[in-house]
Amino acid sequence: MTTLIRRGRRAEEGQERRADSEDSIKDKDEEDSADSKEIRLTLMEEVLLLGLKDKEGYTSFWNDCISSGLRGGILIELFLRGRVVLEPATIRKKRLTDKKVLLKSDKLTGDVLLDETIKHMKATEPAETVQSWIELLTGETWNPFKLQYQLRNVRERIAKNLVEKGILTTEKQNFLLFDMTTHPVTNTTEKQRLVKKLQESLLEKWVNDPHRMDKRTLALLVLAHSSDVLENAFSSLSDEKYDMAMIRSKELLDLEPDTEGTKPNACEMIWAVLSAFNKS
């Protein structure tokens, strides 16, 4: 009799454990499902989204930094996807701005801007530095033979990707003497998620060590600053939190790239891009 009772209890305990296990699996599936609903954006798309005026659908006419910032985003995105690396340091080439960008893999990504850049790099001999590539992709070169490397209509092509992902829409607006295609934000939830991520990285989730930060978040902070759109992400903050976010972002961006780029777990390309913008 006692044996039967024990077996019955074991059976009940086993059922409870299975039920708990099934609940935990269900919870994990729900979390995965929630994660899968998040739209995957490239760094270039995130920078442009931060720079766009929500209702007007265009970037500030006074912003002359975003073009080069988007090109820097292309280089970091290629690095994070394993397509490019920086050449190893030598006695003569210790500084990040002196290192050449080497093509690690010419496998295409499916993103037109990234793939166009891969093709340019594959056809370039000798290799170029990070700063040179930013200038070439922007078209800021005095060498007429290298104008072919300029990426054209970059903002419009990135905006088109965001339209396809359901974040922007396309409209025509009349500006006195000309019509302009604009891309107002329709998915404000996605932009708010992006803004919240940047705010939290400098406030609630501040780690005071760039090498412990998520690499894509660190890259976005660098690119948003270089593109002069970082303050856009802080406009909704209270004065106290705004000041704190600005102080911490300045501390982060004032770090010496050549020193940070050699530390363990450092993402060299992020610091190389920051160094290139500091130098320009």
Curated annotation (Swiss-Prot):
Location relative to the cell: Golgi apparatus, Golgi stack membrane; Golgi apparatus, trans-Golgi network membrane
Q: Where does a 1,2-diacyl-sn-glycero-3-phospho-(1D-myo-inositol 4-phosphate) bind?
A: W62, R71, R152, R155
Looking at the keywords, is Membrane present? yes
GO CC aspect terms: cytosol; Golgi cisterna; Golgi cisterna membrane; Golgi membrane; trans-Golgi network
Which GO MF terms does the UniProt record name?
phosphatidylinositol-4-phosphate binding
Membrane topology according to the record:
Peripheral membrane protein
A family per Pfam = GPP34
User: Subunit composition?
Assistant: Homooligomer.
**What function does the entry list?**
Phosphatidylinositol-4-phosphate-binding protein that may play a role in the process of vesicle budding at the Golgi and anterograde transport to the plasma membrane.
* Protein name (database record): Golgi phosphoprotein 3-like B
